[in-house]
Amino acid sequence: MLDNYEAVLRRYMEALGASDYATIKSLFAEDGTVTSPFLGLMPARDFFDRLGGATKGNVITPIDVFLPSGDQQHAVAYFRYDWTVNGGTLITFNVMDLFEFRSGTDKVGALNLIYDTPDPADSRQQVRKLSARPALASGGRAAG
């Protein structure tokens, strides 16, 4: 199963770099979730729809993939994310995405986004714009 986990993480990073949100959503279980520092817990499909609506382009530079020891059902993708939002602002940060897989499958049940940005105030402003999109409201919350 570890080979499958690694393949999922690499496919995720490739799809994110290509802004291919349909492929990303296909990696998740139907009720999969994403927890974001700025948006909180929300359904994965809604999170990636919202991200896609706010994104002009992505450049993903993989750094490493961390696989579990034993029979644990999680793995971590570590990468540099150069995110260009629709207004043209470029936000660059390193990310460690913690994937939790559904038992006996290679479907992502939960994704926890772990990152820091060099300019948190600017990043929060961009994420607030992202979270304020009424057409994509999903019950997620924006952090202050």
Residue ranges and their predicted role:
Residues 49-144:
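A beta-strand edge to alpha-helix "cap/lid" segment located at domain peripheries
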